[in-house]
C-alpha cells in the first residue's frame, strides 16, 4: 500500500468495520505503523469473530485493534469512540436495495442521520481526515437506498462548503464490489453447489465490477489526494448479468439460469458519474476526482464571471464503460479472494 507513512503513529477508526470492507482494510494495513485501529460496529458477535481471526492470523495486528460497540444512529456512542482519532473510514451503511425499499426510514436513520452524526463528531473532535463510502446508486437515484446515499453525499458536500474546521471530508463512490456481503457472486456459487439454477433478474442488466482490494485502493487514493468535498470514482469495467452468470458457471459448473425479473428499485444500468459531475471531473489516470460545487447561497459570481455549462455529453455508466465479455468476466471474478477460495472448496473461510 502506498502512502502508508501518513498513518505512522496515527489512530484510524472504521465505522461498520466488521463488514467486507473493514476486513479488507485490516489486511491492507497489516504492515503499516498505525498506532491503533478502532472497529466501530453494532454486532458484538461479528466483533468477537474478527477478534479471534486476528489473534490467530496476525497477533501483532490484533494488539493494535480496539473494538467499540455502538451504532452510528446514536450520536453519543459515535463521540465516545472518536476521542483521539486521527482518520475515519466511514463504511457503516444499510446497502441492500430491497430491504431499504420496504423500510426506507431505516435507511435514512443509518445512511443519512448516521453519517451526520459521524461528521459532526469528527469536526468537533478535530479529526484530520474522513473518507465516506457511497454507491453508484446515489447517482440519479430511483430507490430508497440510493436516495439515502445521495442525501449522505449532500451532507458531505454541505460540510465541505460550510467549513469543517481542520477536518477534510471526502467521498468515494463504488460500483458493484464483487463478493462483498449480500452480493450476487457468492449467491450464484451457493446455488451451483446445491444444483439449483442461477436466478437472473434481467440478463441485459449491466453492473460495474471491482474487487474488495480495489475498493480499499480507492479509499486510499481519496485519502491521499482529497480536498474538502471531493468525490472519487474508480474507472471500472462492467458486465451484463447474463454474462456474469455464464462466467460463474464456466468456472464452477453448469446449472442453467432462470430469469425472475427485476427486484424492487433496480435499474437496467448504474451511473457512477452524472453528466453534471463530469463538468467538474478531473481525470487522474485510474480514477476521476469530482470537485465539490463550491457555490454558496449567493450565486452572483456565476452570473458576473460568465456562462456556466450545465451538462456534459453523457454520464459515466455501466452501459458506456469498458464492457467485459464472458472470458473477460471470468478473469475479473477470479481476482476476488472469495472466488479463489471457492475454487478450492474453502469459501467458508472467506470473510464477508
What are these regions (language model features)?
Residues 41, 68-69, 109, 202, ...:
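Conserved residues in the N-terminal Rossmann fold of short-chain dehydrogenase/reductase
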Residues 33-49:
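Conserved glycine-rich Rossmann-like NAD(P)H-binding loop of the short-chain dehydrogenase/reductase
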Residues 90, 94-150, 154:
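Conserved Rossmann-fold NAD(P)-dependent oxidoreductase catalytic core, especially the SDR/UDP-sugar
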Residues 65-87:
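Conserved Rossmann-fold cofactor-binding substructure of NAD(P)-dependent oxidoreductases
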Residues 15, 82-91, 132:
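Rossmann-fold scaffold of SDR-type NAD(P)-dependent oxidoreductases
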Residues 10-32:
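N-terminal Rossmann NAD(P)H-binding glycine-rich loop of SDR-like oxidoreductase domains
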Residues 2-6, 154, 158-352:
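Strand-loop microenvironment adjacent to phosphate/nucleotide-handling motifs in alpha/beta enzyme folds
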Amino acid at each position: 500500500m502506498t502512502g502508508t507513512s501518513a498513518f505512522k503513529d496515527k489512530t484510524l477508526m472504521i465505522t461498520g468495520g466488521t463488514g467486507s470492507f473493514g476486513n479488507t482494510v485490516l489486511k491492507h494495513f497489516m504492515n503499516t505503523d498505525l498506532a491503533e485501529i478502532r472497529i466501530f460496529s453494532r454486532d458484538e458477535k461479528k466483533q468477537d469473530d474478527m477478534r479471534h481471526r486476528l489473534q490467530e492470523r496476525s497477533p501483532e495486528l490484533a494488539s493494535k485493534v480496539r473494538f467499540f460497540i455502538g451504532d452510528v444512529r446514536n450520536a453519543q456512542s459515535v463521540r465516545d469512540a472518536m476521542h483521539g482519532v486521527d482518520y475515519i473510514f466511514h463504511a457503516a451503511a444499510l446497502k441492500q436495495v430491497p430491504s431499504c425499499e420496504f423500510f426506507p426510514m431505516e435507511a435514512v436513520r443509518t445512511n443519512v442521520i448516521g453519517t451526520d452524526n459521524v461528521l459532526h463528531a469528527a469536526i468537533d473532535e478535530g479529526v484530520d481526515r474522513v473518507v465516506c463510502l457511497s454507491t453508484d446508486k446515489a447517482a440519479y437515484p430511483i430507490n430508497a437506498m440510493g436516495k439515502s446515499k445521495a442525501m449522505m453525499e449532500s451532507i458531505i458536500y454541505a460540510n465541505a462548503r460550510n467549513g469543517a474546521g481542520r477536518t477534510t471530508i471526502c467521498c468515494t463512490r463504488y460500483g458493484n464490489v464483487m463478493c462483498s456481503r449480500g452480493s450476487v457472486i457468492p449467491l450464484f456459487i451457493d446455488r451451483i453447489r446445491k444444483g439449483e439454477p442461477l436466478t437472473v433478474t434481467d440478463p441485459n442488466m449491466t453492473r460495474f465490477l471491482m474487487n474488495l482490494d480495489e475498493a480499499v485502493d480507492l479509499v486510499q487514493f481519496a485519502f491521499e489526494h482529497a480536498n474538502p468535498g471531493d468525490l472519487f470514482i474508480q474507472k471500472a469495467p462492467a458486465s451484463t448479468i447474463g454474462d456474469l452468470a455464464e462466467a460463474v458457471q464456466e468456472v464452477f459448473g453448469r446449472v442453467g439460469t432462470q430469469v425472475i425479473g427485476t427486484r424492487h428499485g433496480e435499474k437496467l444500468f448504474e451511473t457512477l458519474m452524472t453528466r453534471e459531475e463530469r463538468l467538474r471531473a478531473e481525470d487522474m489516470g485510474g480514477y476521476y476526482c469530482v470537485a465539490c460545487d463550491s457555490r454558496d447561497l449567493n450565486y452572483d459570481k456565476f452570473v458576473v464571471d460568465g456562462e456556466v455549462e450545465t451538462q456534459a455529453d453523457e454520464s459515466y455508466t455501466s452501459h458506456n464503460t469498458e464492457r467485459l465479455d464472458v472470458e473477460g468476466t471470468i478473469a475479473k471474478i477470479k481476482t476476488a479472494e472469495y472466488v479463489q477460495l471457492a475454487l478450492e472448496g474453502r469459501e467458508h473461510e472467506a470473510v464477508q
